[in-house]
């Protein structure tokens, strides 16, 4: 989301907060002749043409797809050809059509990762939950919590 928001900032001279607000409501399925995209932020209204907005979002997704495609060409073997690519939901949760666009561009299935936890099974939470899980795993492996649990045989 951040890289695409920066593209929007540069192209349309928007503050970062406005660019992320526009991305949160992005829909790649909109007809190109749809009315302009509008966001009100800080008492000011920002309006950009839908066609250019969609083109810029797709261009940002294409840049990401190029990086992933290059990685797959250089680093993957045959075992990865039939497996899906999992995308964390934080940046893509609000962009309708992003996964489909990436799937077409990469010629493979792209799926959104969502943790299997009650109330946290939203794709938008997957990046945060993954970081929390990683941090708590490190803490359990080497921190004072491990020493404390070892006292009780845990």
PLM segments and residue spans:
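Helical "lid/coupling" subdomains associated with nucleotide-phosphate turnover
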Residues: 1-21, 28-154
